[in-house]
Swiss-Prot record:
The organism of origin for this protein: Mus musculus
Motif interval(s): Cx9C motif 2: 136-146
Function text: Transcription factor. Binds to the oxygen responsive element of COX4I2 and activates its transcription under hypoxia conditions (4% oxygen), as well as normoxia conditions (20% oxygen).
Comp. bias (Low complexity): 14-51
Protein name: Coiled-coil-helix-coiled-coil-helix domain-containing protein 2
Length: 153
């Protein structure tokens, strides 16, 4: 009979042993869930880093830089070629064959480089020193007035 009682107790104990296993399983499941919850936080940390501009933003920035560079280049090119070449007047300037005494270094520099060379020099210095050419509009206006006054436009 000991066998019979053993078999009965063994049959009775497995359901009792299964119940604690089922209770233990939910305890293990919460332990497994925190690492899963930690994984999204690890994924979320790169999103907190500052984003780099997209391709379109980089292209727009490059285009803006090209446009500003082109505007500065054209303005400087027109100032230099228009100031030194006489502005394309139909009648060429007649050379002065009379001898004149220089009245100072300023006058001599103006005669050797054209009547608006000081204005051109000031405008170019402003354009080189300023990041925005619009800040040099005053110098550009003075240069334009000089060119008009000397018949170079």
């Amino acid at each position: 009979m000991p066998r019979g009682s053993r078999s009965r107790t063994s049959r009775v104990t497995p359901p009792a042993s299964r119940a604690p296993q089922m209770r233990a399983a939910p305890r293990r499941a919460p332990a497994a869930q925190p690492p899963a919850a930690a994984a999204p936080s690890a994924v979320g940390s790169p999103a907190a880093a500052p984003r780099q501009p997209g391709l379109m933003a980089q292209m727009a920035t490059t285009a803006a830089g090209v446009a500003v560079g082109s505007a500065v280049g054209h303005t400087l090119g027109h100032a230099i070629t228009g100031g030194f070449s006489g502005g394309g007047s139909a009648e060429p300037a007649k050379p002065d064959i009379t001898y004149q005494e220089p009245q100072g270094a300023q006058l001599q520099n103006q005669q050797s480089f054209g009547p608006c060379s000081l204005e051109i020099k000031q405008f170019l210095e402003c354009a080189q020193n300023q990041s925005d050419v619009k800040l040099c509009e005053g110098f550009n206006e003075v240069l334009r007035q000089c060119r008009i006054a000397n018949g170079l436009m």
